[in-house]
Regions:
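Cell-envelope/extracellular polymer assembly enzymes that use nucleotide-activated donors
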Residues: 2-5, 33, 192
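Conserved nucleotide-sugar donor-binding catalytic segment
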Residues: 77, 134-231
């Protein structure tokens, strides 16, 4: 029986999926199964997956496209392991990821969700030398609404018992199923799940300092998707309001400002200066105190948005490259410090 079930939704990722599968098969912890969820992928993604000859791989096929939430739900229902790890099929893991999360969860039985920091990579897999640097411990529910410390869907490893605690029954095409992620959400479904875990269970959510997830920056998205993502986030707010109205009343305004700031950074990555400026301005109108609460990140976001909007692209690229090197070096130093503290 596998100790860990790795759940990988697959849809239209033929350029990246082989790297994702290899990163799982190369794990130093070997007692796992890899559940590849074919979400009606129209390209050669599944054919590529079928070229891997490893008995730990199982392919589960959908008859209709259900999105990330639906694919993850299918994976949870089929999983045999007591720990469930999630990997988006355009991302990758470093070889020690599963081993380190297993050790973390064994050492901390009160932790239900273990996540890692993530390193950014380009579409071609080249390291970006910058990292997602979330808070790792003492994470209150409001922090999930404001900043989503888990960061991306390829970072967490979660106990099955956590999903047992948040399971609910939903009607899908006339058939009742166990749901864990909300399939009504095509975006922000992971944030909604983490908030529900934080608010409705006693499990702790903690991170480990190593950047064990490689998070691919895919420029194929359109800036219009940013505003659809904001709409999905608003749906998360309304769902949460239904069972935790006092919590939402306290956190809604600052959380919306942080979400707008996050989307501004996404617009910057998409090289859309106009959208970035619009989003940072909305963030400040919503809650000016984000400048006092997180001055460095907020100032960097505002500066990048206006530079991208106002200066020639070649000059902006030069400034951005230098800034990324400085930020990446500072982040790498902090990671080394945190890893040393953890070992000692």
């Amino acid at each position: 029986m596998p100790e860990i079930s790795v759940i990988m939704p697959v849809h239209n990722v033929e350029r990246f999926v082989a790297d994702a599968v290899r990163s799982v098969l190369e794990q130093t912890f070997e007692n796992f199964e890899l559940l590849i969820i074919d979400d009606c992928s129209p390209d050669a993604s599944i054919a590529i997956c079928e070229t891997f000859d490893d008995p730990r791989i199982r392919i589960v096929r959908h008859t209709v496209n259900r999105g990330l939430a639906g694919a993850r739900n299918t994976g949870v229902r089929h999983a045999k392991g007591e720990l469930l790890a999630f990997l988006d099929s355009d991302d990758c893991w470093l070889p020690g990821k599963l081993e380190q999360h297993m050790a973390h969860l064994q050492a901390r039985p009160e932790v239900g969700v273990s996540f890692s920091r993530s390193a950014f990579i380009g579409e071609d897999g080249t390291p970006n030398h910058c990292y997602q640097m979330p808070r790792l411990t003492d994470i209150e529910p409001g922090y999930f609404l404001c900043r989503n410390p888990i960061g991306n869907g390829s970072a967490p490893v979660i106990r099955r018992a956590v999903f047992d605690d948040i399971r609910y029954i939903a009607d899908f095409l006339g058939s009742f199923e166990d749901w864990y992620f909300d399939e009504h959400l095509r975006r922000s479904e992971d944030i909604e799940c983490w908030i529900r875990i934080a608010l409705t269970t006693d499990w702790l959510i903690e991170g480990i300092p190593e950047p064990l997830t490689l998070y691919r920056l895919n420029a194929g998205g359109l800036s219009a998707q940013l505003f659809k993502q904001l709409e999905s986030w608003e749906q998360v707010i309304e769902k949460t309001r239904g069972y935790a109205p006092d919590f939402v009343a306290k956190w809604e305004r600052p959380a919306r400002a942080y979400q707008l700031r996050y989307l501004a950074r996404q617009a910057i990555r998409l090289q859309d200066g106009s959208a970035a400026v619009q989003l940072v301005n909305r963030a400040f109108r919503t809650e000016p105190r984000i400048l006092l609460q997180e001055p460095t990140r907020t100032i960097l976001t505002v500066g990048a948005a206006y530079l991208l909007h106002l200066v020639p692209q070649s000059l902006y690229a030069t400034i951005e490259n230098r800034a990324q090197r400085l930020i990446g070096n500072a982040q790498a130093w902090r990671i080394e410090r945190d890893m040393g503290s953890r070992i000692s």
